[in-house]
């Protein structure tokens, strides 16, 4: 397996069966994975903040830092590799309250709400999520099978089982 690390404020696309996309230490950030099971193409975004209007220059410099600029770029890149927008299935993890126990800023919740709004407007189904709470999470997406793994509190679980192989209905 070829592991491709998705860093903070980063986005990667996988198109080969042996590739695994992984992002680590999702606290208040959100890790969004999207996958087309028929084309066996997927992508992952690790964004930090909900809205680029707080710093438009930084949003232009690195659109993956923000939900409103990063999510459309992720969809564009995955579809550019051959995925069909109508078949995209999305999963999200993160959005925790890590350093803000009184939820004064509640960046995690704001990140999650931005995600829901953007995906709804784009017509993309959010099929699953592991958001909120106070735990850091790690996510891995196996491109060949579509399996999605979540690690939280030292325990790993499969969020999405294997999809039928490429070329099916």
UniProtKB/Swiss-Prot annotation:
Q: Which GO terms describe its biological process?
A: chemotaxis
Q: What Pfam families has UniProt attached to this entry?
A: CheD
Organism's domain of life? Bacteria
Gene3D superfamilies recorded = 3.30.1330.200
| GO terms assigned for molecular function | protein-glutamine glutaminase activity
For this protein, the Enzyme Commission number is 3.5.1.44
* SUPFAM superfamilies noted in UniProt: CNF1/YfiH-like putative cysteine hydrolases
Q: Write out the catalysed reaction.
A: L-glutaminyl-[protein] + H2O = L-glutamyl-[protein] + NH4(+)
Q: For this UniProt record, give its keywords in alphabetical order, as a comma-separated list.
A: Chemotaxis, Hydrolase
Q: List the disulfide bonds.
A: none
Is Hydrolase among this UniProt entry's keywords?
A: yes
The record, for PANTHER family, names: CHEMORECEPTOR GLUTAMINE DEAMIDASE CHED-RELATED
Q: What does this protein do?
A: Probably deamidates glutamine residues to glutamate on methyl-accepting chemotaxis receptors (MCPs), playing an important role in chemotaxis.
The family line of this record is: Belongs to the CheD family.
Protein name according to UniProt: Probable chemoreceptor glutamine deamidase CheD
UniProt source species: Solibacter usitatus (strain Ellin6076)
